[in-house]
């Protein structure tokens, strides 16, 4: 006889997170999903491959099993598929590009049909960060294989939503919604979770809108890529959002 886990509403979750041991409890639950030895092996492999790229910020835990490949079977550095709550390989976790690999980054967004990019936090001290799009509406930046136009910028108290148009050499276009969370403290996990939940909720609304308005014949491989360095706490919250939504639907 299997025991069904207790459901938790979003409000109950926020109350739970106020408890001092809540984060360790979430970590314990995470390790019941992903074996510790797998995390250790993946972290060790990642350290060997990217040791020169690691800074003082927390390393991304590789949830899952394989790296992203472009056409020609080329691996994309710092890009891994990640399972969602109900779907395999629902997300791509990656780093924002450096100045010398923007084309490779944009090629991944194009090849994998990514329509939403999420930047949960940006380290102001990361010297390798390169803003590959313009903050000004109507501006266009050209690269070797792509040009990217900033169509619209919407600034909210906790995040910035930028609508981008990616154009390849053949003149074909691809639209991307770029969400950047601006309220997360760079060196602390102490934060108002309601603001972060609101951020994720707005991403989900955009996802629902895209699903509703996609052409009937269009297939979509990957809707969302998480860019930049994602903290462990943020990974837990993003993973738990659909869990909470699913439990709410059952209430």
From Swiss-Prot:
Transmembrane segments: none annotated. InterPro entries: Prot-tyrosine_phosphatase-like, Protein-Tyr_Phosphatase, PTP_cat. Pfam families: Y_phosphatase. Gene3D superfamilies: Protein tyrosine phosphatase superfamily (3.90.190.10). It comes from the Viruses. One of its GO terms (molecular function) is protein tyrosine phosphatase activity. Residues 26-251 form the Tyrosine-protein phosphatase domain. Coiled coil: none annotated. Belongs to the protein-tyrosine phosphatase family. This is Tyrosine phosphatase-like protein J3. The gene is J4.
């Amino acid at each position: 006889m299997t025991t069904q886990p207790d459901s938790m509403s979003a409000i109950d979750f926020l109350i739970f997170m106020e408890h001092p041991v809540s984060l360790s409890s979430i970590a314990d639950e995470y390790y019941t999903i992903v074996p510790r030895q797998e995390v250790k092996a993946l972290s060790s492999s990642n350290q060997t491959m990217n040791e020169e790229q690691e800074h003082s910020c927390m390393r991304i835990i590789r949830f899952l099993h394989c790296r992203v490949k472009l056409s020609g079977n080329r691996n994309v550095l710092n890009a891994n598929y990640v399972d969602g709550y109900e779907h395999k390989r629902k997300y791509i976790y990656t780093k924002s590009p450096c100045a010398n690999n923007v084309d490779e980054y944009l090629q991944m967004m194009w090849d994998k049909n990514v329509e939403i990019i999420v930047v949960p936090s940006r380290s102001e001290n990361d010297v390798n960060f390169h803003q590959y799009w313009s903050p000004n509406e109507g501006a266009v930046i050209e690269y070797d294989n792509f040009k990217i136009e900033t169509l619209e910028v919407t600034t909210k108290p906790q995040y910035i939503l930028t609508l981008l148009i990616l154009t390849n050499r053949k003149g074909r276009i691809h639209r991307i919604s770029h969400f950047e969370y601006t309220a997360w403290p760079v060196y602390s996990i102490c934060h108002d979770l309601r603001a972060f939940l609101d951020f994720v909720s707005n991403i989900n609304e955009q996802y629902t809108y895209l699903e509703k308005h996609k052409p009937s014949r269009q297939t979509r491989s990957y809707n969302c890529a998480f860019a930049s360095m994602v903290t462990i706490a943020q990974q837990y919250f993003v993973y738990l959002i659909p869990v909470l939504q699913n439990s709410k639907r059952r209430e």
